[in-house]
Amino acid sequence: MVSGGGVAAENGEMVGNGEGRKGAGASVLVTGGAGYIGTHTVLRLLEKGFAVTVVDNFHNSVPEALDRVRLIAGAALSARLDFIAGDLKSKDDMEKVFAAKRYDAVIHFAGLKAVGESVAHPQMYYENNVAGTMNLYSAMTKYGCKKIVFSSSATVYGQPEKTPCVEDSKLSALNPYGTTKLVLENYFRQVQAADPEMRVILLRYFNPIGAHRSGDIGEDPRGIPNNLLPYIQQVAVGRRPELNVYGVDYPTRDGTAIRDYIHVVDLADGHIAALEKLFATPDIGCVAYNLGTGCGTTVLEVVKAFEEASGKKIPIKICPRRPGDCTEVYASTDKAKKELGWSARFGIEDMCRDQWNWAKKNPYGYSANAEQN
């Protein structure tokens, strides 16, 4: 270990504490890269010419997902994809990851993300999401990695006072999961203020759905899905009898809640745009961007779009509203369009088409075991 956070390359050149490579060809560490959004982003990084290292502990993912990424990417691109088994909660694991090679930037997906689980197990969420991220950042600073794209969430808007949600809106959190994201946004602002060389982009996702057009990678939740589209998908393939619709008395066009659904491929492209912004903007500081379509879709509109895409009727069961659910949440996308040059390309029909393609090819996700929940 040399002073200033650099490490010595095999040829003796000091690396890791300067600018490093910029843009395509740069080395990117992706935490949680075997997950739903992670796999789609890793694939796009490879297609854009980046060298990618994934660190994952497979808590909510499987090795097969990365095998599928390699299959889609092909041998030439996959030669630039490495994997290191590791857990962000372990400082030793983070040391191992950063001692292995130099990274020009980090995209940080790893973390727990189920709202209900976070309410039941808040300690687990703080240990994984907050403490794990602090371990990651400590390793980054030790080894001179100064750029990070952080996976935040629209949950930081809490119950929005108005829609669309604008990046400078009042922030709040309604559950431990959302609180961990809010805590980490503040953490990154503060550590960046203390180290002006750090470049941080916070990406606030809305509701990612869909899958890669190949149908070879997609969302594969363990147990009962927490999100709407995976649940609809499981009803469509016969794994669940019906879809519970929570509330049909909202003041919306059909009585069901409105959300901003975004295609996971658009979301992956948003990460590429954010990464390129970090490389191009030395004085960026710490900046937040929404990633959504800017359009709200009701629950019943999603059901109808999926029925049309799949040709399957989705039985529904009307249930009371869930406490804390918002009537309407969707993004303002002006800032991302203006500053990142990014906007969503796919509509709800595209999202449902690609989700169904994934479901048809993989009715039980990455597992061939039809006995799984």
Curated annotation (Swiss-Prot):
Substrate binds at residue 153. The gene is UGE-3. The active site is at 177 (proton acceptor). The lineage of its organism: Eukaryota, Viridiplantae, Streptophyta, Embryophyta, Tracheophyta. It catalyses: UDP-alpha-D-glucose = UDP-alpha-D-galactose. Keywords: Carbohydrate metabolism, Galactose metabolism, Isomerase, NAD. One of its GO terms (biological process) is monosaccharide metabolic process. It comes from Oryza sativa subsp. japonica. SUPFAM superfamilies: NAD(P)-binding Rossmann-fold domains. This is UDP-glucose 4-epimerase 3. Its cofactor is NAD(+). The keyword Signal does not apply. One of its GO terms (cellular component) is cytosol. Belongs to the NAD(P)-dependent epimerase/dehydratase family. It is an enzyme of class 5 (isomerase). Its EC number is 5.1.3.2. It holds the Pfam family GDP_Man_Dehyd. InterPro entries: NAD(P)-bd_dom, NAD(P)-bd_dom_sf, UDP_G4E. NAD(+) binds at residues 27-58. GO terms for molecular function: UDP-glucose 4-epimerase activity. Catalyzes the interconversion between UDP-glucose and UDP-galactose. The keyword Membrane does not apply. Pathway: Carbohydrate metabolism; galactose metabolism. Gene3D superfamilies: NAD(P)-binding Rossmann-like Domain (3.40.50.720), UDP-galactose 4-epimerase, domain 1 (3.90.25.10).
